[in-house]
Amino acid sequence: MDTPKTSRREFCAHAISAVTLASLLEGCGSKGNPASPGTGGGGGTPSLSIVNATAASGRVTVNVDAASPLASVGSAALVQAGNQSFLVARTGQDTFNAMTAVCTHEGCVVTGFSSGTFVCPCHGSQYTTSGQVQNGPATRALQRFNTQFTNNVLTITL
């Protein structure tokens, strides 16, 4: 059984075609995962716990009991209400910061939190617990929302 021999020219043509095809397919991929929560904080950063909340009349309400990921000062969580996601950090016994969870760099949902810093899994932007950019590539702060905490219920006003 004779196998046809491939010439050097044919081999090079096939190799160049394969590399070109791979490059084209790479360009069709997405840049991160805009506006949908990821499974990790990126770069080994621990993921935020997800807390489900309810939204009505321009307000999001979150129950914060002893079992909540937001029960202790210095904690943070990814709060989801319908199709909206918020980063919430507990900064004091009765004080919280709430901001959009959508990274200002390319629209990925920020899902990581480590050493008091929110981390975007797509390109590594870092934000303080007040939503300010700590480290790029993002250049704009996260949009903040007013909060009120009464009787173990956190209210975020949109």
Question: What are these language model-derived features?
Answer:
Residues A35-T104, V109-F113, Q143-L158:
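N-terminal pre-ligand scaffold of iron-sulfur
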Residues T111-S114, T129-G131:
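Short Cys/His-rich "knuckle" micro-motifs
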Residues C122-S130, T155:
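Extracellular/periplasmic metallocenter environments
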Residues S23, A98, S115-T117:
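Disulfide-bonded cysteine motifs in exported proteins
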Residues T117-G124, Q134-L142:
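Short cysteine/histidine-rich metal-coordination sites, predominantly Zn2+-binding motifs
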Residues M1-P34:
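N-terminal secretory signal peptides and thylakoid transit peptides that target proteins
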Residues K31, E106-V109, S125-Q126:
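Cys/His-rich metal-chelating microdomains
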Residues E26, A101, E106, F118-C120:
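Extracellular secreted precursors and ectodomains with disulfide-bonded cysteine-rich loops/domains
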